């Protein structure tokens, strides 16, 4: 509940312009809070079984690990914002923490996708990652130039065209506000009022 209230307050203040922050910070905060709530809401036990049994000990620990990875990766972006903005992409070497949090967030996102959308989308994402890592081995036009693991993690985690791209940008601004407004209308029964008003007008 505390995370949900914090997310609502943060999104409303940033989307309305009451709190002006760089888009990267807004997106990182959005992803960190949403993933943390998701791992609390959809425990690994319920995600793995249609008929949940008592959760094994590792289930709770795995959830905590995923929350730590999600929150830690987002916090790293926020606290090291100046460093990320000043570094030269694909020229400056990545630090050990860059690699650690980047890889951790990728794993957390894949696990969150599995819990919400199932294995199909995870398999598609996994194939895309495998292509990025090993696509240089494919012949002809199917292949691409060699990309080091550091380059892939950098592109996904430290640049604006990876995880923090336009899709998350839309989610962190327009989409979230619409979902919040829709949920508010539903819980306050205002949706039926608007529906009846529309029927009267037409």
PLM segments and residue spans:
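Hydrophobic membrane-targeting alpha-helices
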Residues: 8-15, 40, 74-78, 112, ...
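Extended aliphatic helical segments
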Residues: 26, 31-34, 116, 122-124, ...
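Hydrophobic or amphipathic alpha-helical targeting/insertion segments
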Residues: 64-72, 83-86, 99-157
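A sequence-level detector of short, solvent-exposed, charge-rich linear segments
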Residues: 91-94, 128, 132, 199-200
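C-terminal ends of transmembrane helices
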Residues: 39-52, 109-114, 187-188, 192
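Membrane-helix interfacial "entry" motifs
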Residues: 55-59, 91-95, 107, 163, ...
